[in-house]
């Protein structure tokens, strides 16, 4: 099923901008250094509307979760969920998972979730 385009996508994303990493390639090899206080970096591929993302981040405050979604109309719902719940240990990446090696160094990610 195709996601409907959201006419108010841009203002919704702007309200949740703190949860979005716009240049993840610049963090390659430095994720936990950039976001200290977390024991591990975990990755979710295809986070969609972010239900799993928000629940996982809430249940595991000691991990940092990077959630990748290439469809902004779905990702914005997840960004809103995380913002509403006040979760600080998750960030969203508006990227295609095919480019993972550009964003993460070998051995940097401890667990990958595929949804």
Regions found by a protein language model. Give the residues of each.
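A short beta-strand submotif of the Rossmann-like class I SAM-dependent methyltransferase core
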Residues: 114-115
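A short acidic, Gly/Pro-enriched loop at the edge of an enzyme's catalytic core
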Residues: 102-111
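SAM cofactor-binding core of SAM-dependent methyltransferases
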Residues: 40-98, 102
């Amino acid at each position: 099923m195709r996601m409907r385009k959201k006419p108010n996508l841009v203002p919704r994303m702007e309200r949740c901008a703190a949860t979005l990493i716009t240049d993840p390639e610049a963090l390659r090899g430095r994720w936990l250094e950039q976001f200290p206080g977390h024991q591990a970096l975990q990755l979710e591929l295809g986070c969609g509307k972010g239900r799993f993302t928000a629940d996982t981040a809430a249940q595991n405050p000691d991990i940092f979760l990077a959630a990748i979604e290439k469809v902004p109309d779905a990702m914005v719902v997840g960004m809103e969920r995380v913002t509403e719940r006040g979760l600080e240990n998750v960030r969203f990446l508006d990227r295609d998972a095919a480019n993972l090696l550009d964003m993460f160094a070998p051995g940097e990610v401890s667990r990958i979730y595929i949804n």
